[in-house]
Structures are given as structure tokens and as C-alpha cells.
């Protein structure tokens, strides 16, 4: 029969007196020394995880920065090719103007041998326009050069003053290996911040350069289509001159110089043509 343990005459049984007293503390049966070791391991585990995480993030950002710099270099090389293409198209246009002048002279020659030599000459070909210097390309080149010469930490200027731990916590770990780990974490965070600023500036410069090159592509397309139309028209003019004017010129030359051979006639025609240039 069970007895009330609060009775004055209650005596514990032999079995109950040998049972251990249950502990309700969070550390269970740990001693004070074991508890301190436990917290030390937890602190070091947390710091190590933070250190590893910032190291990985820093490497990823540095790699992204290198990719961005490489993209900038490729974009600048592409601009150089586009500029050369535009210059060539401008030179072709200038050549077509000279060709048109010669065609007009040929038309005048075949249309009338005695046309007034003092007739106003066709307009001189305009000078080849120069491709304007791009501000976006200059800025992008400067940014890419700075990042390439300085690496991922080109703009890193030391600790920013912001710390991951409070002053009291830093004082508690001063002189321990944890202080070195915390310092490395702070340095990684500062470098990550610098990488992010570099990427932000690089991204803005890349965007402006892409917009500028898109405008250049529109100009190139217009000039290519313009030159193609002019060349086609001049080809038709030349075919017309060769089809109708050549026979008239040949008849005139034969009537004036019946004894001339073909090469002499062609030479005479070329000299006559030069008079109207």
C-alpha cells in the first residue's frame, strides 16, 4: 500500500532511495567545465561557418567581376570593328560620288561633242565624315582598365568601420583565435562591398556602351542600304551609256578617223572624256 510522502511518519523504501534524482537543467549532467567547452565549440562553429560563407561569396563576386571586365574588353573590340565598318561605308559613299561625277561627264560627252566646256562642274565629293568618339566607350575602357590592373579589390581601401560583433563581444575574444577569424570575416565583407560597387559601375557602363553600339548598328544599316541603292542606280546608268552612247560615239569616231584602229579610237575617247572632268 502506497504511503503519502508528506506524512510525518513516511519512510522511503529501499528501492526508491537508490534511484537518481532527475535533473531539469538544459545541460543535463554536464559539469561547469563541460558547459564552457560546449559554448566554445558552438562559438567556433558559428564563426567558422560565417568565415567559410564569406570566403565563398567573395570568390563568386571576384569571378563575376572578372567576367564583367572580360565582357567589357570584348565589347570595346566589337566597337572598333563597327567603327571600321562605318568608316568603310563612308569611304564607299565618297567613291560613289566620284563615280557619279565621272558618269555625268560620260553622259555629257556622249550626249554632245560640242557641249560648252565652261558649264558648271558637278559638285565635288564631300569629305569622308569621321566617326564621333564615344563617351560611353571611353568610360567603359577606363573602368575595365582600372579593374584589370587592380584585380577584384581595385577599390578596396581597408575596413569600413562596420563590424559583425559588438565592442563588448570583440573585447571578450581579444587575443584568441576567434579574434583573427572575426577580423577575416570583416575583411571579406569589406571586399565583397567593394566588388559589388565595382559590378554596379561596370554594369552601368556596359549598358550605356550597348545602347551606343545599337545606335551605330542603325547607322551602319542605313549607310549600307544607301550605298547599295546608289551602286545599283549607277550600274543602270553605266549599262545605258554602254548600250546607247557607245554606238553613237563609235559612229562619230569612225566618221572622223576612218583609218584608226580600235585601240587608237579608245584612246581618243578616253582623252575626250577627260576634258569634261
UniProtKB/Swiss-Prot annotation:
Residue numbers spanned by region Disordered: 1-30, 49-73, 117-170
GO molecular function, one term: syntaxin binding
InterPro entries listed in its UniProt record: T_SNARE_dom
Summary of the knockout phenotype: RNAi-mediated knockdown results in the aberrant secretion and processing of the aspartic protease hrg-7 with accumulation of hrg-7 in its immature uncleaved form and in the intestine.
Residue spans of biased composition, Basic and acidic residues class: 1-11, 49-65
Stretches with biased composition (Polar residues): 14-28, 134-170
Residue ranges occupied by any t-SNARE coiled-coil homology domain in the UniProt entry: 44-106, 179-241
Family: Belongs to the SNAP-25 family.
Purpose: SNAREs, soluble N-ethylmaleimide-sensitive factor-attachment protein receptors, are essential proteins for fusion of cellular membranes. SNAREs localized on opposing membranes assemble to form a trans-SNARE complex, an extended, parallel four alpha-helical bundle that drives membrane fusion. Plays a role in the processing and secretion of the aspartic protease hrg-7 from the intestine.
The name this protein goes by in its record: Soluble NSF attachment protein 29
Organism ancestry: Eukaryota, Metazoa, Ecdysozoa, Nematoda, Chromadorea
